[in-house]
Amino acid sequence: MLINIQVGDVLEVAANVLISTANPWLNLSGGVNGAILSAVGPTIQEELHTYLHCQGISAVPVGTVVQSEAGNLPFECILHAVAIDPFYDSSVELVRETIVAGLDLAINAGAKTISTPTLATGYGPMSIADFGTAVAPLANEPKFDEISLTIVVRSEEHRSELFEAISAARVSHRR
């Protein structure tokens, strides 16, 4: 998998699929989710709450990825990835598992290009470097060879931090 790092607004980075951060209640309440709600209006929020209602649950388990329409955003769909628990805790392992679930779902949807913010680093406890550590080993997974992942960060400082973490994780993973 080719990993790109870009500074900007994740909602403006065109890709086949956006893997967006989500909370267990699938509420579009802040951060990237709040931006989705502002950009698209209530339709995606209604779709996510309908999903919960149809499943007979009020929240999804940690690690779940739920697909929705993308509205007027430059994606074929949005994958809402729950990489935090109900107390907004997370780990490198949980983020990696959640990203893998999202990438698998994206591939099954026919995606070749995927964009994502750094999951669990806003309201969650993870650092940008932790996210890099979680994602780096996936670059060498054969099942992801045909896709590219663009990780979108908000500053040049975050881009540098993420690049260094991914580079360091790749070196230590090869040992």
Predicted regions span which residues?
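Phosphate/ribose-phosphate-bearing ligand recognition and processing surfaces
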Residues: 84-175
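Glycine-/small-residue-enriched capping loops at alpha/beta junctions
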Residues: 1-108
